[in-house]
């Protein structure tokens, strides 16, 4: 990872789905700028595509349905346990 504008920053990228998604482009750019990332996806099927992408840039991948308050809470708890406080979403 190069040291860029996001060096030592921790971020969340929501909605990673595949290598053509906007979220993937954002994750790649943030990683290239030095960020540590958590990427979310929705559902097991999407996770089969999203998790390897996230892993390829050293990011954590978590399943999170943003329409479910309990899922959001669970995801935030997991993020805090892994990265601590987020600097950007």
Q: How would you describe each model-predicted region?
A:
Residues 1-88:
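Short-chain dehydrogenase/reductase
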